[in-house]
């Protein structure tokens, strides 16, 4: 039976990424679909391009050739064209003309005038997201953060790896952003995946009315529930919303018997070094009972720093170092000793902490 909120096959919705061969978003090999839009404002968000529900632009100055086409195309005058900057370049050269009796060559510093061009500057307050600068840029320096897609287009991408799901016990995960922010889209996608025989998972903050979650349960195999912090005051400070609704929904999910994994981002200044946090998570997991299949510890990583730069945003955690498995052994022990659930530590796959 269709929900009145469910979208139809002809409608478009924004997708920031379809990540194939994902191994961090549920069991097995998976394809993760990232939807755009989220009611939370997590200060460390590693997908900041997914926060706003409308399309935006990435500006990568490393790819910019300073041609100025973007500024010429902007009808709002929101882009300052590349600026010529005169400077000096210093270089060291060896002086081969030694003084009488001197055998060593002397290094001398020389200066030469050079001309550089600073990249264009985008005034995000003037920008109306008309995307004309995206069309004008031929070098990929200015791009859209998301693509408008239909249900069938997403299904085609996801179903193309169906063989790998079956051999690895994987499937499709809907993430974001917050997929519950788009209940009709999420419901329609889950229904299509299940009709195709693809296992489903939902990566969510749990911040939505229970009725929204309840509509999805029939088509869900697993819920990946993010637990940022169980201290409500901290939760409001760092995410912009209370965690009361999230905890209530976790308990109601457990009552239905739906399997879930609790996912714990460990973030500097928020919950790192705070060992009361894993103890509180253990207490919650015990309340949730057999529904908790596992608990995944997710160490902070700085990948979103460059994304925020390309979005023209300030990033609170700029310069903070990555966390690694060895940084979180105390967390792991508390959680592993706290119950029968599986415990994993995620993070940057294949990257080891420098010695």
For each predicted feature, which ranges?
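Short glycine-enriched, charge-decorated loop/helix-capping segments at active-site entrances
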Residues: 59, 236-242, 312-320
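Auxiliary Fe-S-binding modules of radical SAM enzymes
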Residues: 1-25, 268-355
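ATP/adenylate-binding site constellation spanning eukaryotic-like Ser/Thr protein kinases
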Residues: 35, 47, 76, 139, ...
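Conserved AdoMet/S-adenosylmethionine-binding subsite of the radical SAM
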Residues: 152-310
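Residues that scaffold the ATP/ADP-binding catalytic core of kinase and kinase-like folds
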Residues: 41-45, 73, 82, 136, ...
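N-terminal pre-triad scaffold of radical SAM enzymes
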Residues: 16-69, 119-129
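Generic domain-boundary/flexible-linker signal
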Residues: 44, 53-56, 183, 273, ...
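Conserved Radical SAM active-site core
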Residues: 53-219
């Amino acid at each position: 039976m269709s929900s009145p909120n469910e979208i139809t096959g002809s409608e478009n919705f924004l997708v920031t990424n379809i990540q194939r061969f994902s191994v961090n978003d549920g069991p097995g090999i998976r394809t993760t679909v990232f939807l755009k839009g989220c009611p939370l404002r997590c200060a460390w968000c590693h997908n900041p391009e997914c926060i706003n529900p409308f399309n935006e632009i990435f500006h990568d100055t490393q790819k910019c050739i300073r041609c100025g086409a973007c500024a010429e195309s902007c009808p709002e005058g929101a882009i300052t064209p590349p600026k010529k900057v005169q400077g000096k370049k210093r270089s060291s050269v060896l002086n081969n003309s030694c003084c009488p009796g001197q055998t060593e060559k002397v290094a001398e510093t020389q200066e030469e005038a050079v001309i550089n061009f600073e990249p264009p500057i985008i005034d995000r307050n003037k920008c109306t997201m008309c995307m004309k600068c995206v069309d004008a840029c031929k070098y990929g320096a200015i791009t859209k953060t998301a693509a408008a897609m239909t249900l069938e287009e997403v299904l085609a991408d996801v179903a193309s790896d169906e063989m790998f799901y079956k051999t690895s016990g994987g499937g499709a995960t809907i993430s974001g952003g917050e997929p519950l922010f788009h209940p009709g889209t999420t419901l329609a996608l889950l229904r299509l995946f299940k009709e195709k025989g693809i296992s489903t998972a939902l990566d969510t903050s749990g911040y939505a009315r229970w009725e929204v979650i309840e509509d999805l349960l029939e088509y869900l195999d697993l819920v990946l529930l993010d637990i940022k912090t169980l201290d409500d005051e901290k939760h409001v400070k760092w995410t912009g919303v209370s965690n009361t609704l999230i905890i209530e929904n976790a308990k109601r999910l457990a009552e239905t018997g739906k399997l879930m994994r609790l996912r714990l981002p460990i973030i500097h200044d928020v919950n790192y070094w705070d060992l009361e946090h894993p103890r509180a998570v253990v207490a919650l997991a015990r309340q949730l009972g057999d529904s908790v299949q596992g608990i995944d510890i997710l160490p902070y990583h700085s990948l979103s720093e460059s994304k925020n730069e390309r979005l023209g945003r300030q990033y609170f955690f700029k310069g903070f170092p990555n966390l690694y498995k060895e940084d979180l052994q105390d967390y792991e022990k508390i959680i592993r000793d706290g119950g029968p659930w599986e415990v994993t530590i995620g993070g940057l796959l294949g990257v080891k902490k420098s010695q």
